[in-house]
């Protein structure tokens, strides 16, 4: 009966997955609370202490005026104005910054440090995202498919000798390593140099960006004390698009590479067992020891499907 099948589905698959999902969220909440709550309390106490010291040094101000000034600073920050800057700082809405913002909209990163403040800008952002997000998905699909075409040679496994399979695994690992260096290692080094961050902060920004989490605590090109080249944020937006396509390519290839390494390991074990069972004899052409592990294209649907399917 349908109700029995529904209960079986919930009991067999959905319920364990739901429990694992909730437990993972609870674990993350607990660890984040332990790591960050004390630092937040220290920062809050330090801020209150600095306000009291400021009022002691400037007795012409009272607590109410101070709170009003802090409120003005917060409103300016929400609207994308850095309180450390002045009127001579570059605009947050010049073409390069606007291009960077458009990229964060269609990629759904949404740092949160900058957003439209006018009603017309907010309405346009809604319709721009409605069209831009599907367009971004289609673009990344086709870009990832083009990148995947370069892996066609190392994704054909049928009737290949063992030495060729080893070379294919090494080639795939080299491809992933070089791509990771170009996308996830070198850009954080550049960001660290330009922004004055540590490498760990640059890598954190790169991962948070390319995973489309986009907290907004680290954003390139926003420090008013630095002089950036005019195309700096535009180049960062292009890096984001290429990085998203790269991650969409390698995320399915990670399990694939692990699976192929396991296949090679099983192949070595079977050939070793075959050699011990019949020393001095070559295995028959159709035997299991001669064939090793049979791998068909159906085992790797990634080579025949488009990105994101």
Swiss-Prot record:
Bilayer-spanning residue ranges: 14-34, 120-140, 166-186, 238-258
Write out the GO cellular component annotations. Answer: endoplasmic reticulum membrane; mitochondrial inner membrane; monoatomic ion channel complex; plasma membrane
Q: What is this protein called?
A: Potassium channel subfamily K member 16
Q: Could you list which ranges are intramembrane per the record?
A: 98-116, 202-221
**Binding locations of K(+) 2:** 109-110, 213-214
Its encoding gene is what? KCNK16
Domain of life the protein comes from: Eukaryota
Native species of this protein?
Homo sapiens
What keywords is this UniProt entry annotated with?
Cell membrane, Disulfide bond, Endoplasmic reticulum, Ion channel, Ion transport, Membrane, Metal-binding, Mitochondrion, Mitochondrion inner membrane, Potassium, Potassium channel, Potassium transport, Transmembrane, Transmembrane helix, Transport, Voltage-gated channel
């Amino acid at each position: 009966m349908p109700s029995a099948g529904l209960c079986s589905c919930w009991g067999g698959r959905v319920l364990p997955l739901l429990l694992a999902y909730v437990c993972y969220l609870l674990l993350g909440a607990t660890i984040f609370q332990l790591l960050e709550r004390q630092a937040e309390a220290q920062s809050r106490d330090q801020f209150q202490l600095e306000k009291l010291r400021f009022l002691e040094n400037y007795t012409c101000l009272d607590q109410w005026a101070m709170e009003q000034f802090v409120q003005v600073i917060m409103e300016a920050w929400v609207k994308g104005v850095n309180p450390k800057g002045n009127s001579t700082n570059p605009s947050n809405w010049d073409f390069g910054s606007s291009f960077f913002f458009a990229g964060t909209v269609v990629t759904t990163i949404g740092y949160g440090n900058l957003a439209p403040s006018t009603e017309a800008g907010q309405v346009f952002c809604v319709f721009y995202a409605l069209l831009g997000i599907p367009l971004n998905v289609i673009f990344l699909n086709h870009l990832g498919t083009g990148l995947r075409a370069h892996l066609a040679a190392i994704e054909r496994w049928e009737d290949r000798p063992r030495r060729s399979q080893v070379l294919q695994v090494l080639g795939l690992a080299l491809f992933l390593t070089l791509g990771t260096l170009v996308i996830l290692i070198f850009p954080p080094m550049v960001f660290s140099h330009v922004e004055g961050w540590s490498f760990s902060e640059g890598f954190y920004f790169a991962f948070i960006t390319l995973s489309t989490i986009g907290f907004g605590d680290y954003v390139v090109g926003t420090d008013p004390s630095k002089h950036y080249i005019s195309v700096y944020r535009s180049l960062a937006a292009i890096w984001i698009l290429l990085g998203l396509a790269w991650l969409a390519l390698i995320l399915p290839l990670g399990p694939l590479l692990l699976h192929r390494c396991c296949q090679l390991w099983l192949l070595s074990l079977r050939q070793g067992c075959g050699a011990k069972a019949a020393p001095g004899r070559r295995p028959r052409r159709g035997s299991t020891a001669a064939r090793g592990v049979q791998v068909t294209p159906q085992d790797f649907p990634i080579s025949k499907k488009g990105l994101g399917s």
